Amino acid sequence: VMMPCVPPWKSEWVPRGNAPSGYRSHIALCKAADETYLVGWVDYEPGYAPNVQAELEANRDNFVNGMQAQLLTTTNTTWQGFPALEFTARRGDTHDITSRVVMKATRPYQLAVLTPAGQHRSANIDRFMASQRLK
């Protein structure tokens, strides 16, 4: 993924309730001027068999809720042959959010861009989103 800066990476183990199982999340945030770029993915424990559509929707919903945003659009699609969900959201009256979640095997990958609300930034968003490569 091409980002306008070299972001620090954060990885953390997230347990599932009181169970010993869980997942490891990996996130990088890049702030460039008044735009924020996010790349993330999750590694689940061995043997986890997700319902792909439910996983895509849960990633979207958790992200939108975590950002305290309102979902505006959502589209089921594919990215490089893998199931994907693209969506937009609005965070209050300050930020527009454009995001894609792609499911490759048991690993969901997410890209997101936050831009000032109502400003036309499609060139930056499109360049970032198009740079995603899944091996």
Range-by-range predicted roles:
Residues V1-S11, E55-L71, T106-K135:
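Surface-exposed amphipathic alpha-helical segments
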Residues D34, D43, E55, D61, ...:
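Acidic-enriched, low-complexity/disordered segments with a strong bias for Aspartate over Glutamate
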Residues V42-Y44, G92, T106, P116-A117:
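Solvent-exposed coil/turn segments that connect beta secondary-structure elements
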